[in-house]
From Swiss-Prot:
Record keyword Transferase present: no
PROSITE patterns per UniProt: GIY_YIG, UVR, UVRC
Annotated Pfam families: GIY-YIG (PF01541), UVR (PF02151), UvrC_RNaseH (PF22920), UvrC_RNaseH_dom (PF08459)
GO molecular function: DNA binding; excinuclease ABC activity
Main location: cytoplasm
Keywords: Cytoplasm, DNA damage, DNA excision, DNA repair, Excision nuclease, SOS response
Compartments reported by the entry: Cytoplasm
Quaternary structure and interacting proteins, as annotated: Interacts with UvrB in an incision complex.
Family: Belongs to the UvrC family.
Protein name: UvrABC system protein C
GO BP annotations, alphabetical order: nucleotide-excision repair; SOS response
Superkingdom of the organism of origin: Bacteria
Length: 600
């Protein structure tokens, strides 16, 4: 596609709000943006004389992006607010090359109390609880369960959600049996108020726990004392040491960004009743370190942290600095939560001090990250294999089966120098050959890009054929993901797997690479492949055991192994065999065998 074609596309832009997308010569998505007026916004990227080129008045990052752009697409929306929400969704799902993606798809827990209950108690939730008299505390980015356990350990509140008579907790003085009316509502409320005060003031809770730990140790109950010691350590880790006096007992949130040495640091303070009760920080390596866009980051950060299904306790959000779409975000959040939400930049006073503190901590977190993690290998991979992204988030895929039995796939995740086991995935597969199995696994993962953002790199256990397959799937999604594959060298058209002699080759879209066995890049990729292989084999073995157990049940009915395999090949799994219609079974394996299955 030529620049002439792009110039013609620019002429079709409407004077309405919407989202625009830039693509390169290979059809890869470069950038997603939103506009109040698509025609004016998109044309501001270009200069038109003597011919079409990047506007020199824009940043170097934008100029470089426009130089690569050969095609644009756009979607109109009813308003700029709708465009901003759609833009954020596209960035998360498609991971464009020149957009910065904040990888935090977690929902964090809140502790809440339902005052509609006769004797309220603390519970944990990650979503909005649709009841009228709920008080929330949080979100807590870590340690919510430990806090809750500590509260129930020290304060004799109702321990069970439903209980009709005094239980073991009453016998050990951990509950005052409100279920049996052994405590008045007024006295119970006094204890609950003390517990809520302790929740907002962890130092109070710590003092109480330390006293209890000492008593247990003196009574030689060392096991329980050790549990409390661990709770104390967790709660101490939650405490935020702030020498700023927030005079008012108010609720608000604080956000700050810092950028240094190609690292983006985001930080969030949650303030309730004038106390910082929770802190969340995140480090994101920037893949295109020419420049970064604070407006883009603040938009993502605030929209992702305040999704529609969570409680928003504060009505004021303070940010460290001004950004372009601040007022628009105010409007979106106010509509989303049906109340007035303000996003402010404080100039003086305690709010300015706390914003400055958030920024200072964001900078410190970058320094800590760089001391703790070495990104040398990622930089070497990016340079050597000419990757578009710095591969900090890597997904590795492998399949496992035994002659078409117990077909499974596995995905493991390596994120910023460590395994992220919370994102490991297992797949039961329908297909029997390696190619179709990998297609099934990769397609299922790609379909989840809108829920779990794509990584920087896919590593496939296989050769060029599977590499091309992965490329086809990624191109179909429009996502910006680099791809590598690792396979054993072939001798006489067969993979050479002799112990001690097996040599791996790396396949990229740029070609095939044979690296020295001592090469750190090869060893790193082998480590990733081996973990995926281990995970896939383990899942295959467990699946095979379960299938063997179920197969033995059918064998006990007098069905031959051939009949069982025929049934599995047709129905895919044992559950479908048992649920199958008698007529269908009879047509496949005969009436006698079908009758045995249905009768048992």
């Amino acid at each position: 596609m030529t620049k002439e074609k792009l110039e013609n596309e620019l002429k079709t832009l409407p004077n309405s709000a919407g989202v625009y997308e830039y693509f390169n010569q290979e059809g890869k998505l470069l950038y997603v943006g939103k506009a109040k007026n698509l025609k004016n916004r998109v044309k501001s990227y270009f200069a038109f004389t003597p011919n079409l080129h990047a506007n020199p008045g824009n940043s170097l990052r934008i100029q470089k992006m426009i130089q690569e752009t050969v095609h644009l697409e756009f979607i109109t929306t009813n308003s700029e607010a709708d465009a901003l929400i759609l833009e954020n969704s596209f960035i998360k799902q498609l991971h464009p090359k020149y957009n910065i993606l904040l990888r935090d798809d977690k929902t964090y827990p809140y502790i809440y109390v339902d005052f509609k209950e006769e004797f309220p108690r603390f519970e944990i939730t990650r979503k909005l609880v649709k009841k009228s008299k709920i008080k929330y505390f949080g979100p807590f980015f870590k340690g919510a369960r430990e806090l809750l356990d500590a509260l129930y350990l020290y304060y004799p509140l109702k321990q069970k959600a439903s209980c009709k008579s005094p239980c073991i907790f009453y016998q050990i003085s951990r509950c005052l049996a409100p279920c049996d009316k052994r405590i008045s509502k007024e006295k119970y409320r006094e204890i609950l108020d003390e517990a809520m005060h302790a929740l907002l003031n962890p130092s109070v809770l710590l003092k109480n726990l330390e006293k209890q730990m000492l008593v247990l140790a003196q009574n030689e109950n060392y096991e329980e004392a050790a549990k409390i010691r661990d709770q104390i350590a967790t709660i101490k880790d939650l405490e935020v040491k702030v020498e700023i006096d927030i005079a008012k007992l108010e609720d608000f949130e604080v956000f700050a960004l810092a950028f240094k040495n190609s690292m983006l640091s985001t930080l969030r303070f949650v303030v309730q009743n004038g106390k910082i009760i929770s802190v969340n920080s995140k480090i994101t390596p920037i893949k295109n370190d020419i420049q970064w866009d604070k407006n883009e980051i603040y938009k993502q950060l605030i929209l992702e942290n305040f999704s529609m299904d969570i409680p928003l306790l504060a009505s004021v959000i303070y940010v460290y600095e001004e950004f372009e779409d601040r007022m628009l975000l105010e409007k979106i959040l106010s509509q989303r939560f049906d109340k007035k939400i303000s996003i402010k930049i404080p100039k003086i006073g305690e709010k300015r001090k706390i914003c400055d503190l958030a920024f200072q901590n964001a900078l410190l977190n970058i320094e800590k990250e760089q001391k703790n993690h070495d990104f040398t290998i990622q930089k070497e991979l990016k340079s050597y294999f000419e990757l578009e992204n710095l591969p900090n988030d890597i997904e590795i895929f492998d399949n496992s089966h035994l002659q078409g039995v117990a077909n499974v796939g596995a995905m493991v995740t390596y994120s910023v120098n460590s395994w992220d086991k919370s994102k490991y995935r297992k797949f039961h597969l329908k297909h029997k050959n390696d190619y179709d199995q990998m297609r099934e696994v990769l397609t299922r993962r790609a379909l989840d890009f809108d829920k779990i953002p794509p990584p920087d790199l896919w590593l496939i256990d296989g050769g060029k054929v599977l590499l091309d397959l992965a490329k086809e799937i990624i191109l179909s999604t429009g996502a910006n993901v680099d791809i590598l594959a690792i396979s054993k060298e072939k001798i006489d058209a067969k993979a050479h797997r002799a112990k001690g002699g097996a040599k791996d080759k790396i396949h990229s879209l740029k070609g095939e690479f044979s690296l020295s066995v001592n090469d750190k890049k090869l060893q790193f990729l082998q480590k990733l492949r081996d973990e995926a292989h281990r995970f896939a084999i383990s899942f295959h073995q467990n699946t095979k055991k379960k299938q063997d157990l179920k197969s033995s049940k059918l064998a006990n009915l007098g069905l031959s192994l051939g009949v069982i395999q025929k049934l599995l090949a047709y129905y895919g799994n044992f559950e479908s065999i048992y649920k199958a219609d008698f007529k269908d079974l009879a047509m496949l394996v005969g009436k006698k065998a079908a009758q045995k299955i249905k009768e048992n």
